[in-house]
Regions:
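A short linear-motif detector with a strong N-terminal bias
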Residues: 13-14, 26-27, 47, 165-168
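Glycine-rich, highly charged phosphate/nucleotide-binding loops
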Residues: 10-23
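Short glycine-rich, polar/acidic loop-and-turn segments at beta strand-coil junctions
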Residues: 13, 38-40, 192
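Acidic catalytic cores of enzymes that act on phosphate-bearing nucleotides/polynucleotides
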Residues: 143-207
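Metal-dependent phosphoesterase core characteristic of DEDDh/y 3'-5' exonuclease domains
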Residues: 1-8, 25-135, 141
Length: 208
């Protein structure tokens, strides 16, 4: 991922602070699209804490000039909007969105799962698979690669579709989200509910 050798971090004479500076310099000077799998909920949090405790700017990868694609979120879209990606059905009868399961379902060798090197190789192969099989989802993910891009897309698009991380039906067919700083209010229609059953309903009926 970076040209920094792991052995130099373990056995080298640099401090943790120096390591944080080196990582910060690398990410600052290499403004590429960053891919991760569940990185929003895990990796970026760990990195922010690491930067903070070493006196570095913790939100380096959250600025408006950075693009981050979380392939777990792309997997939600692949599950709901495409038949091109294979999924393992778990014990609950639902499609498994674990990185290892997605890889195995699509013929990708995961090596030794949950080790840094093999997990990174698996991530790269899943990214290649998604780019080949569902390019429209990957390019849309890049278009929505940070919160500023998402807000712009939600304002500019007449219809904005997104996939929920959960697969169960929402309790209400219509949800209003007022996002601070946006010019308009966003209404989300849950398409798990048949729109014909409520599209002409009154506000009182919908609120039930």
């Amino acid at each position: 991922v970076t040209p920094i050798a792991a052995q130099s971090l373990i056995h080298g004479d640099q401090s943790q602070y120096q390591m944080a500076c080196k990582l910060g310099d690398y990410f600052r000077d290499n403004q590429r699209v960053l891919f991760s799998f569940n990185g929003i909920n895990y990796d970026l949090k760990v990195l922010r804490h690491f930067y903070f405790e070493n006196l570095q700017y913790p939100y380096q990868l959250s600025q408006d000039d950075r693009i981050h694609v979380d392939l777990l979120h792309a997997s939600y879209a692949a599950r709901d909007f495409s038949d091109e990606i294979q999924f393992i059905i778990n014990e609950k009868g639902k499609k498994s969105l674990k990185q290892t399961d997605i890889a195995l379902a699509n013929g990708i060798d995961v090596g030794v799962a949950h080790t840094a090197a093999d997990d990174t190789k698996t991530l790269m192969q899943i990214a290649d698979l998604f780019l080949e099989k569902i390019p429209e989802i990957i390019f849309t993910a890049i278009e929505c690669g940070n919160k500023f891009r998402v807000q712009n897309k939600m304002i500019e698009e007449e219809y904005f579709c997104h996939s929920n991380p959960w697969s169960s039906k929402a309790l209400a067919p219509l949800i209003r989200n007022s996002i601070k700083g946006m010019e308009n209010e966003i209404y989300f229609f849950d398409l798990a509910h048949d729109p014909e059953k409520y599209i002409n309903a009154s506000e009182t009926e919908i609120s039930k």
